[in-house]
Amino acid sequence: VARMAEAAWRRIRSLVARRRPRARVAAAWGGRAHVEGVDRDGLAVALEVLSAKRSESDVVGLKLEAARLAELALGDVGPAKGRAAVFDGYAALLPAAALSPVSGEVSRVVDAVFPSADPELDIELARLAAMVSSARPQLLSKFLARLDQGFHPVSDLHFLITVARIPLQRNSAQRKRTAAALVGLQAKIDRMSLNQDSNWDDRLGELYAALCANDKQLPRAVLETPGFGLPSHVLFLQRMSREDRPRARATFVAAIRKAGEDYPWSGEVVRLLGESGDAQTLKLLRSAHERVDVRGSVVLELARRTQGVDRKRFVAGLQSSSLAVLSSCLGALAKLPAARGAREQLALLSVVRRLGPAAQEHGLRSRAVLVLRRNTGKRFGFVTGEKGRVAQQTAVAAWTDHLERTYPEETKRLLGAAAASLPVLRKRLVAVDWDGGDVSRGKQVFTKRGCVGCHQGRRALGPDLAGSAGRFSRADLFTAIVLPNRDVSPRYQTTVVQTSDGRVYNGLIVYQSVDGLTLRTGTNRTIRLEK
């Protein structure tokens, strides 16, 4: 029907006008392609079928088809410039002015039919009301009544998005029901172990903003709802007043203390607590440093108000693979008085050794050297700034030799059992006749020992070693062979994943989604791990 000539379509339309509803719905569905703007005839057919009370066994299926026909007649749903993406499946592509003449009739029919005996039909009826931004108070009450603890979270989301499209004033009971649905959404998702898309917070934030636009008192109602204080609730603070924000933070603190070690900390919660200058709140924040998943976020917040009591945390943060965390820790240590502790100097040395000459990394290397100079009074010729963006083998070796000789016990502790072999290695390197070396034999060892799998080719897990002799000293290269984990650049630090059945995988994450992740291992295997 959609591909018919206009004259043929008009004839078909007149012929099916006296036919059974299913034929009329099918013809109108295909005929939508022949109509610009709102398809009044198709909409009339759809609303007639939706309103009818029939006893046929397939009446629900027919009404579902009619609901879809009504959506098509209204221009269908989809993305539009300037409209939040959360409404892509709930807002018509046609402008509001085109829908206004039919909004009342659509709302009246939906009100008469909703709720039906079929959940799927109810979803489409609600979508119709959302498309025309129904202003019918009865529908708002009916849709809000579906926000109940017994419904699936997907159903809650559907009706929350629907009511966000209804521009009517809310009463106190409606406000509380909306707030309870928002606050309880994450708990439902967690209980059912449902996966959440990486764009979840963005879409939920858009939904919340629209709900608040219809009800300015909703943020406070959310704050006063029992159960408020989970990490997913932080985004609700975006619409809270400045006066309510400290109260909200106190509610999070109470929730954390009540849950104890079971509280699911997140970076957002850490940042929220970091806004407080309260000593007890900061103490609670420091306790989260023991959790690996938020340790970086904790250090970032503590660095904003550098205190000597956190020095050991800043030193530990120097091992982070995050350059942002590393930068904050260096900045905090630079603000604190000079110290000569072994752990701090060797952690700073680790930064100097593992970072490269790229602009951002060299900037951090230079800052680490400046703190070392202040702490030790030594210089060793390391060049900071733009001119220093080269390997600087001699300076790095001098710093390494000085600090390892100054702090031998801490060096052994950090390097582990392999540290005992370093003196022997250094003596052997001195005795080797380097002029008698054979490159071809080296290539054979490089291949046979499996080094090639990680350090050569486009699928390599580690850095390509071509030209490495020009970037590192001979001693450093052999030390890296003996202690391969000593100086690992942040870009090549791997992730260890343990599955529920006890299997362990180690590799670089090359792709991550809501359903799982893909690892590339040192044996050049690409493994997909499902959640």
Show which residues each predicted segment covers:
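Short, histidine-centered active-site or binding-site loop motifs used for metal coordination
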Residues: 122, 458-459
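The canonical Cys-X-X-Cys-His
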Residues: 442-458, 465
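Gly/Gly-Pro-rich "capping" loops immediately C-terminal to redox-active cysteine motifs
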Residues: 459-484, 494-531
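Flexible loop/turn segments at secondary-structure boundaries
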Residues: 22, 134, 168, 452-453, ...
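Long, ordered, helix-rich scaffold segments
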Residues: 1-445, 468, 474, 500, ...
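Active-site phosphate-binding and catalytic loops of NTP-dependent enzymes
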Residues: 488-492
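Residues at helix-coil transition
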Residues: 290, 447, 456, 482-483
